[in-house]
A protein has these predicted regions:
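Long, contiguous binding/interaction regions
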Residues: 1-194
Length: 194
């Protein structure tokens, strides 16, 4: 899968490989301190070896991870990364996603989430959930747009909220009344009356 990057280069989204260790380390180290804190829920310096192992050792079954790559020489090799880790029962998985500052707002996160949802659906996982710092308004907006709902303030003391959604496709609801009219006007497509 390729998509347009900010500098009009093609990005490729693929599963993480062990050979991505150096690129993932560079990606994490290039994040500003606030972005690292939002992604890892705490201050980290660089990319410690234990973290690097967790980022690269995805088995493709219980732990699935993707990277968005930019091959342009002046751009970072990894534009974003996303992953999920399934629970012991295999019916739900916690996910995480992070996009380099240079690629935010370019659709990279949307494509990474699409890949995660497709992989989870194929694995029979019913729910994805993510724990997000309450102050991370950008991520909260992204989660809403992706169909996630705030499940509960997970840890009010730490300021972490849990967002979740079903992995299945979003249901298409029948539009009625004003909502039906507005939907037709916005979509500019005729909607058959039922």
């Amino acid at each position: 899968m390729t998509l347009a990057a900010p500098a009009r280069h093609a990005l490729t989204v693929r599963p993480v490989r062990l050979a991505d260790a150096q690129s993932l380390q560079d990606f994490v180290q290039a994040l500003d301190p606030a972005s690292r804190r939002m992604r890892f829920h705490g201050a980290i310096n660089g990319c410690p070896p234990a973290l690097l192992r967790r980022l690269t050792e995805a088995d493709g079954v219980r732990h699935v991870a993707f990277v968005a790559l930019d091959s342009a020489p002046q751009c970072p090799a990894i534009a974003g990364e996303a992953r999920y880790v399934a629970n012991a029962e295999g019916d739900a998985a916690e996910f995480a996603i992070c996009v380099s500052e240079a690629y935010r707002g370019s659709g990279v996160a949307d494509e990474l989430m699409r890949q995660l949802l497709n992989a989870a659906r194929a694995a029979g996982i019913g729910w994805l959930y993510g724990d997000v710092l309450a102050e991370n308004m950008r991520m909260a907006g992204f989660m809403r747009r992706q169909g996630f709902a705030l499940a509960w303030p997970f840890d009010a003391e730490a300021g972490i909220e849990r967002w979740e959604r079903a992995v299945r496709e979003r249901p298409q609801h029948r539009k009625r009344g004003f909502g039906r009219w507005l939907g037709m006007w916005l979509n500019r497509e005729p909607v058959a009356a039922r």
